[in-house]
């Protein structure tokens, strides 16, 4: 399995790029906020149980996808202070352990564009 690991600041366009890549590749998108929202519905953001549950969801998804023989998966990720230091290495270990490959792509944009994107109503919940 090819895991396309899109990372960058919040609002930089990871989900937009992921959706376009999904159209081109046929790979499903695993949006970071699916795990964040799940853990956050039960635990306070950043609390030890939140961090543990979020990471378990992320890693279990990668493990199951790789073991199931998916051709690929697109993951959106924004590092924050609550992410365990060894997380990325654990992702690589899981995917590569199943014969897969992790492809990292950092997304960036200008400060002006980032400010515009964050202010965009579509980002408000």
Question: What do the predicted segments below correspond to?
Answer:
Residues 16-66:
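Conserved substrate/cofactor phosphate-moiety recognition/catalytic segment
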Residues 70-75, 99-103:
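Loop/turn-to-beta-strand initiation segments
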Residues 10:
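The conserved Walker
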Residues 35-36, 80, 108-113:
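Conserved nucleotide-binding/hydrolysis micro-motifs of P-loop NTPases
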Residues 95-125:
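A glycine- and Lys/Arg-enriched "phosphate-lid" helix/loop adjacent to the NTP-binding pocket
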Residues 3:
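Walker A (P-loop) ATP-phosphate-binding motif of ABC ATPase nucleotide-binding domains
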Residues 6:
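Hydrophobic anchor at the beta1->P-loop junction of P-loop NTPases
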């Amino acid at each position: 399995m090819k895991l396309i690991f899109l990372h960058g600041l919040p609002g930089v366009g990871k989900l937009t790029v992921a959706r376009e890549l999904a159209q081109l590749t046929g790979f499903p998108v695993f949006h970071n906020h699916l795990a964040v929202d799940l853990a956050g519905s039960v635990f306070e953001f950043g609390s030890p149980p939140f961090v543990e549950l979020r990471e378990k969801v992320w890693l279990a998804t990668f493990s199951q996808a790789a073991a199931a023989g998916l051709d690929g998966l697109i993951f959106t990720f924004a590092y924050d202070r609550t992410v365990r230091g060894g997380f990325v290495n654990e992702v690589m270990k899981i995917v590569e352990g199943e014969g897969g490959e992790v492809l990292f792509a950092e997304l960036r944009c200008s400060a002006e564009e980032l400010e515009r994107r964050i202010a965009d109503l579509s980002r408000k919940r």
